[in-house]
């Protein structure tokens, strides 16, 4: 935590001195975009970084005759819904819009489309990731 505090103390001095109070006006040419965003977020919340990650790691595994994604591990926003994830997978696999895609958590149940990935991660995540199986036909439950 002391390292985080040191980083937070160093970051505000550069953006405020160079660009005044308007952090959004910084361009990639004058300053890197990452320090202003972390400086704007970090001082208000001082919780452990492991519990409050904005993105979580999910592991996507194909089931049955569904095409396999070459990239299996993805970082996804906690607020993304299962339906948003289904739409992303369909687009990534270039599936026809009329084709169905089912998502299963731990090979046991299909979460509702409006369920947030962050909530599933908190309940069913293990080893720092959430394992989701996807398929074009119903497999479990």
Curated annotation (Swiss-Prot):
InterPro entries assigned to the protein according to its UniProt record, in alphabetical order: Atg12, Ubiquitin-like_domsf
Post-translational modification: Acetylated by EP300.
Topological category with respect to the lipid bilayer: Peripheral membrane protein
Organ and tissue specificity: Ubiquitous.
GO cellular component, one term: protein-containing complex
Cellular compartment(s): Cytoplasm; Preautophagosomal structure membrane
One Pfam family named in its UniProt record: APG12
Protein's UniProt keywords contain Acetylation: yes
Location of cross-link Glycyl lysine isopeptide (Gly-Lys) (interchain with K-? in acceptor protein): 141
Residue stretches of biased makeup (Low complexity): 23-40
CDD domains: Ubl_ATG12
Positions in coiled-coil regions: none
GO terms (BP aspect): autophagosome assembly; autophagy; macroautophagy; negative regulation of defense response to virus; negative regulation of innate immune response; negative regulation of type I interferon production; positive regulation of viral translation; regulation of autophagosome maturation
UniProt-annotated stretches for the region Disordered: 1-53
Subunit-structure text: Forms a conjugate with ATG5. Part of the minor complex composed of 4 sets of ATG12-ATG5 and ATG16L1 (400 kDa); this complex interacts with ATG3 leading to disruption of ATG7 interaction and promotion of ATG8-like proteins lipidation. Forms an 800-kDa complex composed of ATG12-ATG5 and ATG16L2. Interacts with DHX58/RIG-1, IFIH1/MDA5 and MAVS/IPS-1 in monomeric form as well as in ATG12-ATG5 conjugate. The interaction with MAVS is further enhanced upon vesicular stomatitis virus (VSV) infection.
Record remark on domains: Shares weak sequence similarity with ubiquitin family, but contains an 'ubiquitin superfold' and the C-terminal Gly is required for isopeptide linkage.
Family: Belongs to the ATG12 family.
Function: Ubiquitin-like protein involved in autophagy vesicles formation. Conjugation with ATG5 through a ubiquitin-like conjugating system involving also ATG7 as an E1-like activating enzyme and ATG10 as an E2-like conjugating enzyme, is essential for its function. The ATG12-ATG5 conjugate acts as an E3-like enzyme which is required for lipidation of ATG8 family proteins and their association to the vesicle membranes.
Protein name, per record: Ubiquitin-like protein ATG12
Organism from which the protein derives: Mus musculus
Gene from which this protein is expressed: Atg12
């Amino acid at each position: 935590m002391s390292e985080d505090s040191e980083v937070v103390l160093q970051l505000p001095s550069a953006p405020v001195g160079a660009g005044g109070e308007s952090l959004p006006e910084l361009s990639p040419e004058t300053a890197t975009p990452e320090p202003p965003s972390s400086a704007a977020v970090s001082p208000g919340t001082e919780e452990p970084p492991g519990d409050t990650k904005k993105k979580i790691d999910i592991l996507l595994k194909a089931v049955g005759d569904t095409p396999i994604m070459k990239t299996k591990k993805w970082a996804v926003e906690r607020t993304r819904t299962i339906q948003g994830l289904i739409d992303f997978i369909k687009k990534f696999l270039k599936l026809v819009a009329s084709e169905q895609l089912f998502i299963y958590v731990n090979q046991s149940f299909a979460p509702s489309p409006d369920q947030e990935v962050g909530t599933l991660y908190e309940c069913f995540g293990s080893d720092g990731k959430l394992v989701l199986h996807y398929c074009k036909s119903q497999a479990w439950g």
